[in-house]
Amino acid sequence: MDIEALEFRAACLQAARNFFIGRGYLELDTPALSPALIPESCLEVFRTEYLKPFKTGEEAAVPLFLVPSPEVFIKPVIAAHGRSVFQLSKCYRNCESVGHIHSPEFTMLEYYTMQADYRDSIKITEDFLQTMAQAVAGLPLADPELGAVLSKPFLQLTMDEAFKRFAGFSLAEAETPDLAAHAERLGLGGRAQYESWEWDDLYELLLVHCIEPQLPSDVPVALLDYPARVPCLAQERSEQRTAADGRTYIWKTKERWEVYVRGVELANCYTEARDAEEINRSFADEAAI
């Protein structure tokens, strides 16, 4: 890595720290190794072991994991002390392709804000990206066009609005056969091949192959209010609506958003779920997969 790249990275890390420390967040530095992780079936992890000195047999080796996120250590700190916190952490995820977007080892910024919800965090993240763009603007490796994009307010679309705009139908009104029909209409294969697919599988297919590629590239885009049919540990909201045919229905969403810049997902945020039974049930379901 050349000196310009090292200076650019150092400036980014320092600007990130300045942003959150200046707003009263406590910086954490948690371990990279953990004896247990939060169950997430979508992630492959790195496993290793600690070899105890002067021990033999079953007691000699202690299984450990490289953390895919510092969340497992951050949340106990929040629960114990009630502080807004952030961390710039090395994270490790197995089975990742290696390229300019993905890597098995990468640096993640994770922050938690007390007395705030997911919409508050949109503004915080918007301010953060604008601050970062300004902080590195004069460096040789800074991309002026990307800096101009990051300096703009987010375009905010609910997931239902995004499907209406880019796929031509209301996600809120669509059942599983409807999603299969729309996938066929949009050139994603024949309906027959989706006979065994669930609603969330078809939703993911349409999101990845139809919605995400059409998101504007000249402004950061925040997709929010994800369908509750897609499990995640976020607060749930319910809204009574009237369909085009006059029937009323309840549209359930999760207080979640993701931000895309030039088609790449940069950030993911929840209003954290607080129901202990829901959280324990989710952990059990994930661990069973």
Task: Describe the function of each predicted region.
Residues 131-266, 285-289:
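Metal-assisted phosphate- and nucleotidyl-transfer catalytic regions
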Residues 98, 133, 278-280:
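A short, polar/proline- and glycine-enriched secondary-structure boundary/capping micro-motif
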Residues 34-39, 94-96, 229-233, 241-242, ...:
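Flexible loop/turn segments at secondary-structure boundaries
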Residues 42-45, 50-59, 124, 136-150, ...:
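Contiguous N-terminal and early-domain "leader" segments and peripheral loops that mark the onset or edge
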Residues 7-15, 23, 28, 68-73, ...:
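Generic recognition of stable, solvent-exposed alpha-helical segments in well-folded globular domains
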Residues 1-120, 130, 227:
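Class II aminoacyl-tRNA synthetase-like tRNA-binding/catalytic domains
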Residues 77-78, 100, 234-236, 270-272:
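Short conserved micro-motifs at the rims of enzyme active sites and ligand-binding pockets
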Residues 44, 277-289:
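Compositionally biased, low-complexity linear motifs
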